[in-house]
Amino acid sequence: MLHRAFSVFLFDKENRLLLQQRAPSKITFPSLWTNTCCSHPLYGYEPSEVDTPEDIANGAVPGAKRAAVRKLFHELGIPRKEVPVSKFKYLTRLHYRAKDEFAVNQSMAGGPWGEHEMDYILFIKPGVPVTIAPNPDEVNDVKWVNREELRAMMDPSSGLRWSPWFRIICDKF
C-alpha cells in the first residue's frame, strides 16, 4: 500500500553525513546501512505530521519536518532543540517500491515485507554538534562520513548492504 515516508540526511559543520545501520531486530530491512533517519509521518499527532496538498505544492511540508524531529529523537536520541523544524530543507519527493530480501532471519529467502512509499527527502545542517544516543531497538551503529568515505562504503566490494531507498536517492541525486 502506498504511504508517505521521509528520509533525513543530517550533515555536520564539515559536511559529513550521519549514517545509521538499522538494528538487526527491525522487521523490515534489518541490519542495512542507510541515511540518518527514515520513518513515517503519523496521523493524529498534534501538531499535525500530515501535510496538506498546499504544503506539498509550496515545499513547506511542516508535518514531515515535525515527524523527522520526533524520529531523530526516538531513533538517535537527538534532542529536539538541536534539530529545529526551521533548519530542515525539503528537497523533493521520491516514489519507489522495494521488496525486503532479508526480512526473514536475514536470509536471501526473504519474506512478505517491503515498502511502497512517497518519500519526502529532507536535509538538515544544524550548525551545532548534535547529541547522539542511539536507541538499540532501532539502530545498531552510526557513522559520520564524507563523500569519499561514503563512496568507499557503497562500493560493492565493501560487503555492506544498503537500504533500497538510500541507494535510489544516491543514484538519482
Question: Which residues does each PLM region occupy?
Answer:
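Conserved Nudix-box catalytic region and its N-terminal flanking loop in Nudix hydrolases
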Residues: 1-78
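Short, conserved, surface-exposed binding loops centered on an aromatic residue
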Residues: 9-11, 82-83, 110-114
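Nudix hydrolase/Nudix homology domain
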Residues: 37, 43, 89-173
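Poly-acidic low-complexity segments
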Residues: 63, 84, 134-135
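Short, structured loop/turn "capping" segments at alpha-beta junctions
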Residues: 78-89
